Structures are given as structure tokens and as C-alpha cells.
């Protein structure tokens, strides 16, 4: 007779056996420990699962029963109750299957194991979906679950082999990948744990760029504006005729962005893990995302949600670029839904009785033509009238425009610039300038929760942005003359702070403010009609 795992106060009841093992789930991009309690007793035979379960979890009983049978373990005619706690948290998905199977085996005392092994099991997390043949299948959200488990005293994780790479970067946890339930049973039969996964070195960020700035002829003011935007993580709108180079300059941006910090890389990898977008051999994500959206995107795909409350594109772009080409052609409700994540840097997804808050710290890069046909101001090709152009530009509402710090008008490249032998600024040189400005911001905001000038809260503007009397007068005149909003005023200040950082200046100068106002282009979009 094997070891009994129920509480000693019930030791007189030979028909009551109890076990407890641990699994986990994701809440947003955070993990949560789940206790899997199993009670086996005399009574009407059956396998009952309780604990606020989605249908995918309720179906686990049949999957586990078949997987155990096909691995050589037949369940006796007993009443088996499995409780997943805490009971007030909804459990969804098939990631609890392995833990449920282990709990049943322990509760039935199917194998005789030592006290030492049982204690080790209590410090082990079990994850994985089971196929009917006993195959252990991969799951989503491994990284945040393992991270949470490590912080709660777990020292070993049994998980699908495909999920081992992403989990291996969590310190002080032994990762034991398995591909079949038979490997899990060998723990009880032989007292031997599966072989540990050997973590590979974290790959360095790739130096490969989509487009090098040096390949773009002319457009020096546009390049400067893009450098400022990236340095301070400011939203940017590129406006110009078709073929002027808007999409090309947007594709330069990933190559000039600063590298991800460890914390940013961890957060981004958790996001992609929860979304199920990490490759089986993938470790940490080391490059900033560049998410280019299709014009037929739905609001759910953009913000997140759906049946599994998956992260949307605004979350997948965290730390990187969210690119919307032909911005006015997107559905109006999609454009307007960007208001809240652009302002708050988070997005809340609600489903049933649960809501999840995901990060949405992206840099919006948008592009549009001057008019519906795309040829304005070339009147030989463009036949749009002023009313049509104005209507087209106003598809982007004032509240959205107010959240865009830099609005660049891009003119077609002249013939002389196109064939000039003079080489423009390269992406490498641009990145060096951005890194210098980034280092100044890191030094300035070292103890803050925000990292970039564009993220300075309104309540801390005076602390980090100081203006002389002359500058305040200029801003007051502009504020009153252009009917600038309060939001726009503070965004100009943040932009001026970034321009000063690019120039290596501690104090904001008159030229910095004037340049910020130029790039803000408050009278846009109809000032040239």
C-alpha cells in the first residue's frame, strides 16, 4: 500500500484520500498560482471538476482519463473530485491537464513513493495540455506563469517541451520539459525527474535594419523630425503625396530605436507568450516590435479581447512601433478607439465577469496622403476640390490629432537630391544621436515609473521642464493665437525637452520651443488649402 496524502486528522477514514499539487494560469500578462486538489472516496463513480471552470477545463476529465488509460493507468471505480482554487477566479484553457492527472495519481495512491519525493512534488509546478494518447501539448502564457511560480517558492516546473525555451530564463527554477505523460509517470515509478533544460545564451539584438536612412535622398527635415520622435517616443504623422517616401521613412524607425532593456524584454516576451506568438525555440524577444496594421483590422484585433481575451495590436506593439499607413482609410471606430491607449498607455479588456489590463506603450507612426487621390499638390494629376480635401483630412478627428506630437509634411524629392552624390545621415549615425538623448532621459527619470519625455505626467511637468520668461510669453502667444488645447500645450513642452536632449542641452532654449511648435504644426491640416 502506498503513502496516503490526506490530512492526518482524517487518518481513521480509509475511504478518504486527498492530494494537492500546483498549476497556474495567466491574468493579463501576469501569472497566478492555482491549487489542484483531488479527493478520492467511495460513492457513485465519476470524475467531477469544480472551481469556476470554463468548458475547456470541464472537458479535462475526459482528456485526462483517456491519456492515463493510454499510458497504462486505468482509473478505478471511485468518486473523484478535483477542485481548482481559488474558486473566485475563472479558469480557462487546457493547461491544467497534467496537474489534474498527477493529482489523481497521488490521491489514488497508485504508486508507492517516498516522503522526500512527495515533498519535492509540493515544490513543483505542473503545466500542459494532454492529448488522448498521452502526448503533452504546448500552451500559451508559460513565461508569466513560471515567473509567478518562482516568486512563490516553486523550484521545479514540469511543462511541454515546446515551452521550455521561454521558461528557461526565469532564475532559480529547474525546467523539466516532457513530451508524453509516460515521462511524468516515471517520476513516480523510478523516482527520477525528467532531464533539465539547458538554457541557451540570450541572443544579442540584431543590427539588421529594414531600410537605412542613408538610402533616403533629401528629406533632411523629415529625418530630423523622425529622430526627435524616436528619441522621446513621440507619436508622429507623416503627410505627403503618394511616392514621397512616407512608408520608406517609417520602415527606417525600427533600425534607429534604442535596444530593449532587460525589463522591457521580459515584459514584451510575456506579452507574446500570452498571445501564443512565441516560436517553440524562442527565448527572450530582443528587438522592438514593428506592427504594421491592415486597413480592414477590427476593433477587437486592435485593442484585444475575443474568446480568450488575447492581447491586441496596441499591446503587441509595446516598446515599439504601431504603424498605420493610409491612416484616414481605417474605419472611424478603429481610429477613435486609439484615444484611450494613446493617452493612458494601457488598455483594459473585459470578458464575462473578468477584466484584464494590458500595457499599450507604443509609438504611433501614421502616414496619409494630402488628398483622396494622393496627388495633391500636383494639380496636373489631382482634381480634388478644397471641400473633398478638407473632408478627407478631417477623417482623423481633433482628439486623435491632439495626441500626435509631430506632424511632418513631406514634399516629393527634387531631381537634384534624388541623384546627389552626397550621402545623407545613416541609421547608425541617427541611432547614436538617439542613444545620447536616451541616456539623458535615463539619468533624469532614473527613479520614476516612466522612461521617455513623452510620458512625463502633467503633474511633473514643472519639475522636469523649466522655461524662462521669454519662452513662456512665446508659448502663451501661440496658445492663444492657434486655439491650442491644454493637452497640446503640455505636449509641446515635452517635445521641446526632447529637442534639447538631442542637442545635449540641460536648459530648453528659444530655438527648441520654436522647433517644437514647427513640428507640432498646430494649424494643420488645412493651412495649405
Question: Which residue stretches match the model-derived regions?
Answer:
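Basic, amphipathic alpha-helical bundle interface domains used for macromolecular binding and assembly
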Residues: 56-61, 76, 83-93, 309, ...
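Hydrophobic residues in beta-strands of the RecA-like P-loop NTPase core, especially within AAA+ ATPase
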Residues: 127, 178, 324-330
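Conserved alpha-helical scaffold flanking the Walker A/P-loop in AAA+ ATPase domains
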Residues: 227, 289, 300-322
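Walker A/P-loop
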Residues: 238-277
Amino acid at each position: 500500500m502506498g503513502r496516503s496524502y490526506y490530512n492526518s486528522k482524517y487518518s481513521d477514514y480509509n475511504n478518504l484520500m486527498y492530494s494537492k499539487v500546483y498549476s497556474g494560469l495567466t491574468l493579463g500578462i501576469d501569472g497566478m498560482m492555482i491549487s489542484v486538489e483531488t479527493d478520492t472516496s467511495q460513492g457513485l463513480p465519476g470524475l467531477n471538476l469544480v472551481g469556476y471552470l470554463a468548458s475547456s477545463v470541464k472537458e479535462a476529465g475526459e482528456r485526462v482519463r483517456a491519456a492515463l488509460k493510454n499510458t497504462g493507468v486505468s482509473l478505478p471505480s471511485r468518486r473523484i473530485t478535483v477542485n481548482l482554487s481559488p474558486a473566485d477566479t475563472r479558469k480557462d484553457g487546457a493547461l491544467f491537464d497534467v496537474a489534474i492527472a498527477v493529482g489523481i495519481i497521488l490521491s489514488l495512491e497508485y504508486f508507492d513513493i517516498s516522503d522526500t519525493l512527495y515533498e519535492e512534488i509540493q515544490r513543483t509546478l505542473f503545466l500542459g495540455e494532454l492529448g488522448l494518447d498521452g502526448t503533452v501539448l504546448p500552451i500559451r502564457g508559460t513565461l508569466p506563469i513560471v515567473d509567478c511560480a518562482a516568486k512563490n517558492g516553486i523550484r521545479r516546473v514540469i511543462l511541454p517541451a515546446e515551452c521550455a525555451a521561454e521558461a528557461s530564463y526565469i532564475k532559480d527554477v529547474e525546467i523539466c520539459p516532457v513530451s508524453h505523460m509516460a515521462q511524468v509517470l516515471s517520476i513516480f515509478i523510478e523516482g527520477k525527474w525528467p532531464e533539465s533544460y539547458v538554457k541557451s545564451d540570450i541572443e544579442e539584438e540584431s543590427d539588421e535594419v529594414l531600410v537605412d536612412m542613408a538610402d533616403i535622398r533629401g528629406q533632411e527635415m523629415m529625418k530630423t523630425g523622425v529622430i526627435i520622435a524616436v528619441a522621446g517616443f513621440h507619436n508622429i504623422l507623416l503627410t505627403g503625396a503618394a511616392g514621397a517616401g512616407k512608408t520608406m521613412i517609417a520602415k527606417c524607425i525600427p533600425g534607429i530605436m534604442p535596444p530593449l532593456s532587460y525589463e522591457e524584454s521580459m515584459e514584451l516576451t510575456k506579452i507574446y507568450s500570452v498571445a501564443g506568438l512565441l516560436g517553440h525555440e524562442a527565448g527572450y524577444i530582443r528587438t522592438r516590435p514593428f506592427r504594421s496594421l491592415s486597413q480592414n483590422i477590427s476593433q477587437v484585433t486592435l485593442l484585444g479581447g475575443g474568446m480568450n481575451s488575447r492581447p491586441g495590436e496596441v499591446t503587441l506593439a509595446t516598446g515599439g512601433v504601431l504603424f498605420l499607413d493610409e491612416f484616414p482609410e481605417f474605419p472611424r471606430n478603429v481610429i477613435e478607439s486609439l484615444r484611450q491607449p494613446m493617452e493612458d498607455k494601457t488598455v483594459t479588456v473585459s470578458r464575462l465577469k473578468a477584466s484584464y489590463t494590458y500595457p499599450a506603450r507604443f509609438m504611433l507612426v501614421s502616414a496619409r496622403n494630402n488628398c483622396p487621390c494622393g496627388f495633391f499638390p500636383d494639380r496636373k494629376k489631382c482634381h480634388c476640390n478644397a471641400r473633398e480635401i478638407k473632408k478627407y483630412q478631417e477623417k482623423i478627428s481633433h482628439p486623435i490629432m491632439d495626441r500626435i506630437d509631430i506632424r511632418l509634411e513631406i514634399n516629393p524629392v527634387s531631381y537634384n537630391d534624388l541623384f546627389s552624390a552626397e550621402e545623407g545621415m545613416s541609421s547608425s549615425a541617427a541611432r547614436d544621436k538617439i542613444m545620447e538623448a536616451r541616456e539623458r532621459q535615463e539619468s533624469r527619470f532614473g527613479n520614476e515609473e516612466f522612461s521617455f519625455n513623452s510620458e512625463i505626467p502633467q503633474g511633473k511637468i514643472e519639475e522636469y521642464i523649466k522655461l524662462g520668461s521669454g519662452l513662456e510669453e512665446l508659448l502663451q502667444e501661440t496658445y492663444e493665437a492657434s486655439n491650442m488645447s491644454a493637452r497640446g500645450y503640455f505636449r509641446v513642452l515635452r517635445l521641446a525637452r526632447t529637442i534639447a536632449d538631442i542637442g545635449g542641452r540641460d536648459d530648453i532654449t528659444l530655438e527648441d520651443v520654436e522647433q517644437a511648435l514647427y513640428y507640432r504644426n498646430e494649424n494643420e491640416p488645412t493651412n495649405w488649402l
